[in-house]
Structure formats: structure tokens, C-alpha cells
Amino acid sequence: MNRRFWFGLLIVLSVLPAACASVPKDPQARAVYERNNDPLEPLNRQIFAFNLRADQYVMRPVTKAYRAVTTPDFRKGVRTFFANLHTPVTVVNDILQLNLPEAGKELSRFTINSTLGFFGIFDVADRLGIAPQAQSFGNTLGVWGSPPGPFLMLPLLGPSDVRDLIGMGADIAFDPLTYAAVTHDRRTMASILVSMDILEALAKYENSLDLLDDARKNSLDYYAYTRSMYQQYRRAAVDEAAGRKNSEGQKASYEFSLDDFDDEDTE
């Protein structure tokens, strides 16, 4: 996990000086430029094109094979297993956000699902009325008032921003699995953790594949669409964590989270 984060960060930082788009002089174009918050757009579009090729030649064939040899219940179990593994990260961020009631709920979920749910394969806690929620250090930074910073497109990892990139590193530090690799045989644990990373990424991608296909077919500019949806989703997630209201006066929701489609698995 550490290698994945630092590799992406190194690539981004190494090309920042040459990758920035020039600021438009036209007032209307400048307003659009500032709203998109994407000064690295030329570079980001190149990385996005690379990600699409990786999707076409690697992720999509592997995902379709994974879908062909597994059942919807199996795939859902994989997703809930990994969601349960990341619960300690959510608990830490709830505490940092001073949201102690939610931290207590997540601890209850983790205990119930790790025992009665067979290590999180089954979401027993949700059936008992303890709904899941996910927090990240990117959310915590947003609650603390940190702006998102420029939009970033990371190789293979997809859309992000400066705040979430920093948050990714902190979440890795909060993750107990990170220390399992340090305290045990490093080579063996590294192999196990990389395998788990791959399986988790595959499970999440498979669950969102149909949604992504629809978005690609129905958008005139798939990159701009991806950027817009990511930024809206992240604003909603931070507002949700902070308990703020959106422009309609309603509580912000995870409208754009791919996790909302967990129960829409396909054969």
C-alpha cells in the first residue's frame, strides 16, 4: 500500500512544473477555469487516457472473468469483508472529527461483523439497524477547513485532489494492516497485502463497471464528466461528515458514491 501511494505521488510531483495549464485571460473562460480547479488539466487528461487504455486491456478483461466465475453473493461478501477491514480507519477519523457517537457505532459494527459476520463477510450489523458509513482523512481535513486543492488524475488510481492525496497517506498510516507488514515477515506480508489490494480494487471496479459504462456512453467529454462527478461527490462527503446542509437545505448525501450500488450487483 505504501508503494502504491508514494509511486503515484512521485509521478505527480515530478511533472508539476511543466504540466500546468495557462490561466485564460478571458473573464468567462477564467471563471470556468477556476470552477474546475484543474490547473494540471493537460497532464491529467494524458493520465486519464492512459487509465482508459489500462482499463480496456487489463482491468476490463480481468473483471469480466472475475464476474463470470463468481456469484453476486460472493462478490458482495468480498466487498463487505474489505469494508470491515477498513473500519478502524473510519473510527480514527470519526474521533478526529469529534464525532464520538459515530465512532461508537463503527466500533459496534466492527465487533459484530468481525464475529457474527465471519470477519466481515456478512454485514450483520446493517441488518441490526447499524448502518455503515465510511470516513477518510481527506474528509477530516475538509471538516477542519482545508480546501481540496487542485484536481488530480492519478495513474491507475483515478481521480483525486491534493487534500485527498494527503489523506490517502494518513489513512495508510491509520490502517492496522500497514503495521502487520512491518511486524511480521515483510516479504510474505507484502505479497499478501498486494494480493489483497488487487482483490479489493477488482471487487470495487466490478461493482461499478456498469455505472462507468453508462457514464462513458452518455457523456460528451468523459474526462470532464469524471472530474465534475468526483468533485461533487467529495463536496457532499465532506458536508456529510461536517453535518452541513447542501444548497437545497437538505443534509448532504453520498449521492455520487459508487458504494451506493452495493445491492445492484449483476449476474
Segments (PLM) and residue ranges:
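Mid-length scaffold segments of soluble, non-membrane domains
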Residues: 84-162
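A structured, mid-to-C-terminal "fold-capping" secondary-structure block
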Residues: 22-34, 145-267
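Bacterial N-terminal signal peptides that target proteins for export
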Residues: 1-9
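Beta-rich strand-turn-strand
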Residues: 79-81
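C-terminal motif of bacterial Sec signal peptides marking the signal peptidase cleavage site
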Residues: 16-19
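Membrane interface segments of multi-pass transport proteins and intramembrane proteases
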Residues: 57, 64-73
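Post-signal peptide N-terminal segment of mature Sec-exported envelope proteins
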Residues: 28-57, 87
